[in-house]
Amino acid sequence: KPIVFTGTSDNIKIGEKMGTNLTVDDAGLWGGILILGKAKISASDTEGKDINETQIEGIPASDTYGLYGGSDDTDNSGTLKYVSIRHGGALIGEGNEINGLTLGGVGSGTKISYVEVVSNKDDGIEFFGGAVDCDYCLTTAHDDDGIDIDQSYSGKITNALVVQGAGSDHALEIDGPEGSMVAGY
């Protein structure tokens, strides 16, 4: 059975796979999961200068727990496996959102497998640089992109499925570097 992250208004009970009162239109009931690591990112500051560490979206700039990036592409942020992330996401401001699963500078030592994101207010899964691999990932009924890649993400995404909803934007958004570091994706 998966580990289910959902809003408090979901009437799902322990041992059940889903509740009965929420639909795919019920997004933004809570934030989302953010995993921040020390792998390489391609970012720049407000003056356009390269930086290897920056603040993740959705966390106040004054909070140092929101910093990610570094120089260790093999960084290990743990394991996220057999997880369902439902009815989350938040639009805080332009370019400042919380996705279902946000991965900032997460290294290849981290294991992410069998993750689904259902009915999220912004992107299903967003990678900000890093080198983590993600396999068996599903996003459905997201309000923006299914999978979004930024800041020279260099990991592999295998066995992924994106199912668009009525409010979805793109299945994939793949952006290049913000700084001068270029990685393959």
Q: Which residue stretches match the model-derived regions?
A:
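Beta-strand/loop edge motif enriched in small/polar residues
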Residues: 1-185
